[in-house]
Amino acid sequence: MEPSQSINLIILGLIVVMHAGVLALRLGISLARI
């Protein structure tokens, strides 16, 4: 595997984790408001 490929995978993983965190926060806020 080339180093650039692993770096791209790490960036993709970080983006996925960030999106999951944002979705979880939005769900928690919407549930707390109810």
UniProtKB/Swiss-Prot annotation:
Keywords of this entry: Membrane, Photosynthesis, Photosystem I, Thylakoid, Transmembrane, Transmembrane helix
Principal location: membrane
Protein's cellular compartments: Cellular thylakoid membrane
Keyword Transmembrane: yes
Source species, domain of life: Bacteria
Bilayer-crossing regions: 9-29
Protein's GO biological process: photosynthesis
Any one cellular-component term (Gene Ontology): plasma membrane-derived thylakoid membrane
Membrane topology designation: Single-pass membrane protein
InterPro entries named in the record: PSI_PsaM
Family: Belongs to the PsaM family.
Descriptive protein name: Photosystem I reaction center subunit XII
Organism: Prochlorococcus marinus (strain MIT 9515)
